[in-house]
């Protein structure tokens, strides 16, 4: 579709206005417990975390120190400095205690008849996510966002759900200070069975010049319920909020 350049301020109306209204997203910020170290049963709902530190997410377990030059001793050869032999170095990662294992725990309520996804903006690193004692997903990379659908692991009896996250930073795993822990936001996303999944919408502008722009929109629709007809309505709005074009697709 071709439209004037000023129309590149676009809004994809999800799968229709009604579907947008049925999606909710909340930050899981407060009521977290944290402890450095590894704990065999920390993923289980009955685990006693009352003596753990109360924290707010985002949280970095190493940023407050203590600083110690021995925290990041590395026997390495820095190739960018044209070194050919390894030598003992310190301070390359800030001298902060980011190495080690840590656990985070919290609880949340979620409706049993919806689809529930957890989105982590960043978790450093090797994140193992548990819901009610069962592993939901694993993500090794600390800088990338990731998400996992946890619907099948939720309590169906109205009880709160226990979320536990195990993180591990290995020695000499970084050349700079990488951070440690749940250092970015955690989102709780609740949708209907028919929904646009996380990152399910892509908007690109493959051709742009002073006279026109081509806007390409692609949306994925997931249906975790019974098979039914699905209507997807897409609108492009002008900067003033007026509908410039509308397209409707139906799937059975």
Residue ranges with predicted function:
Residues 45-46, 228-234:
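Short flexible loop/turn segments that cap and initiate beta-strands
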Residues 51-53, 137, 244-245:
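Aromatic (tryptophan-biased) beta-strands that constitute blades/sheets of beta-rich domains
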Residues 213, 223-228:
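Edge/loop elements at the starts and ends of beta-strands within beta-rich repeat scaffolds
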Residues 217-221, 231-234, 246-247:
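Intrinsically disordered, low-complexity terminal/linker regions enriched in Pro/Ser/Gly
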């Amino acid at each position: 579709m071709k439209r004037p350049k000023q129309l590149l301020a676009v809004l994809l109306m999800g799968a229709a206005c009604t579907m947008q209204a049925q999606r909710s997203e909340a930050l899981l910020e407060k009521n977290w417990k944290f402890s450095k170290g590894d704990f065999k049963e920390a993923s289980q709902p009955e685990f006693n975390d009352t003596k753990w530190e109360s924290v707010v997410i985002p949280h970095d377990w190493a940023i407050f120190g203590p600083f110690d030059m021995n925290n990041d001793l590395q026997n390495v050869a820095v190739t960018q400095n044209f070194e050919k032999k390894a030598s003992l170095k310190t301070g390359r990662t800030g001298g902060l205690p980011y190495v080690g294992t840590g656990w985070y725990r919290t609880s949340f309520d979620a409706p049993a008849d919806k689809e529930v996804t957890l989105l982590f903006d960043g978790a450093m690193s090797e994140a193992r996510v548990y819901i009610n004692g069962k592993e939901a997903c694993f993500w090794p990379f600390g800088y990338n966002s990731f998400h996992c659908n946890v619907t099948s692991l939720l309590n169906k009896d109205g009880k709160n759900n226990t979320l536990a996250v195990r993180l591990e930073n290995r020695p000499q795993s970084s050349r700079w200070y990488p951070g440690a822990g749940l250092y970015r936001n955690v989102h709780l996303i609740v949708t209907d069975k028919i929904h646009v999944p996380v990152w399910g919408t892509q908007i690109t502008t493959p051709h742009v010049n002073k006279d026109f722009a081509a806007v390409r929109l692609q949306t994925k629709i997931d249906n975790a319920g019974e098979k039914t007809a699905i209507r997807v309505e897409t609108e492009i709005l002008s900067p003033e909020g007026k509908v410039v074009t509308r397209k409707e697709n139906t799937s059975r």
